Amino acid sequence: EPGPSSDLTTLTTKFAAKGLTPSDLTVLSGGHTIGQSECQFFKTRIYNDTNIDTNFATSRQANCPFSAGGETNLAPLDSLTPNRFDNNYYKDLVSNRGLLHSDQVLFNGGSQDTLVRTYSTNNVKFFSDFAAAIVKMSKISPLTGIAGEIRKNCRVIN
């Protein structure tokens, strides 16, 4: 699976291996509009990346010290509306406020910039494309019969 420090080439290659397009990658990454990440996964970005809003980096550094400690401290993946499914994740990217390196590479002068900008201004298109990509992803090598299970709680095996 792709990691939080992956570059765009790595991400698109890993998604392509599952039959997903770069556009699928970009829209599915929008799932990060909800959720959090531990400091250990974004520390390098907030102290070393140059494509990051300075005020954003400083605010995240307050809860994620450069020296040892705080590795499990959490920060929201969507700084604007972390508990609402919307397109603000993309607004963060356009403002160089992506928490993970692997998020910000979607908007960094590369092939996905136009789509990120579109989603940042068009919530309806994001919702529609996200739904279609989720359905597409659900068809990737599904486990059937006794090999798979439908969980009532994703974290607990039935």
Swiss-Prot record:
<keyword id="KW-0349">Heme</keyword>
<keyword id="KW-1015">Disulfide bond</keyword>
<feature type="binding site">
    <location>
        <position position="2"/>
    </location>
    <ligand>
        <name>substrate</name>
    </ligand>
</feature>
<dbReference type="GO" id="GO:0046872">
    <property type="term" value="F:metal ion binding"/>
</dbReference>
<dbReference type="GO" id="GO:0140825">
    <property type="term" value="F:lactoperoxidase activity"/>
</dbReference>
<keyword id="KW-0106">Calcium</keyword>
<dbReference type="Pfam" id="PF00141">
    <property type="entry name" value="peroxidase"/>
</dbReference>
<dbReference type="InterPro" id="IPR010255">
    <property type="entry name" value="Haem_peroxidase_sf"/>
</dbReference>
<keyword id="KW-0408">Iron</keyword>
<feature type="disulfide bond">
    <location>
        <begin position="39"/>
        <end position="64"/>
    </location>
</feature>
<keyword id="KW-0560">Oxidoreductase</keyword>
<dbReference type="InterPro" id="IPR000823">
    <property type="entry name" value="Peroxidase_pln"/>
</dbReference>
<dbReference type="InterPro" id="IPR002016">
    <property type="entry name" value="Haem_peroxidase"/>
</dbReference>
<comment type="similarity">
    <text>Belongs to the peroxidase family. Classical plant (class III) peroxidase subfamily.</text>
</comment>
<keyword id="KW-0479">Metal-binding</keyword>
<feature type="binding site">
    <location>
        <position position="78"/>
    </location>
    <ligand>
        <name>Ca(2+)</name>
    </ligand>
</feature>
<dbReference type="GO" id="GO:0020037">
    <property type="term" value="F:heme binding"/>
</dbReference>
<keyword id="KW-0376">Hydrogen peroxide</keyword>
<keyword id="KW-0575">Peroxidase</keyword>
<feature type="binding site">
    <location>
        <position position="81"/>
    </location>
    <ligand>
        <name>Ca(2+)</name>
    </ligand>
</feature>
<dbReference type="GO" id="GO:0042744">
    <property type="term" value="P:hydrogen peroxide catabolic process"/>
</dbReference>
<comment type="function">
    <text>Removal of H(2)O(2), oxidation of toxic reductants, biosynthesis and degradation of lignin, suberization, auxin catabolism, response to environmental stresses such as wounding, pathogen attack and oxidative stress. These functions might be dependent on each isozyme/isoform in each plant tissue.</text>
</comment>
<dbReference type="GO" id="GO:0006979">
    <property type="term" value="P:response to oxidative stress"/>
</dbReference>
<feature type="binding site">
    <location>
        <position position="86"/>
    </location>
    <ligand>
        <name>Ca(2+)</name>
    </ligand>
</feature>
<keyword id="KW-0325">Glycoprotein</keyword>
<feature type="glycosylation site" description="N-linked (GlcNAc...) asparagine">
    <location>
        <position position="48"/>
    </location>
</feature>
<feature type="binding site" description="axial binding residue">
    <location>
        <position position="32"/>
    </location>
    <ligand>
        <name>heme b</name>
    </ligand>
</feature>
<protein>
    <recommendedName>
        <fullName>Peroxidase</fullName>
        <ecNumber>1.11.1.7</ecNumber>
    </recommendedName>
</protein>
<feature type="binding site">
    <location>
        <position position="33"/>
    </location>
    <ligand>
        <name>Ca(2+)</name>
    </ligand>
</feature>
<dbReference type="InterPro" id="IPR019793">
    <property type="entry name" value="Peroxidases_heam-ligand_BS"/>
</dbReference>
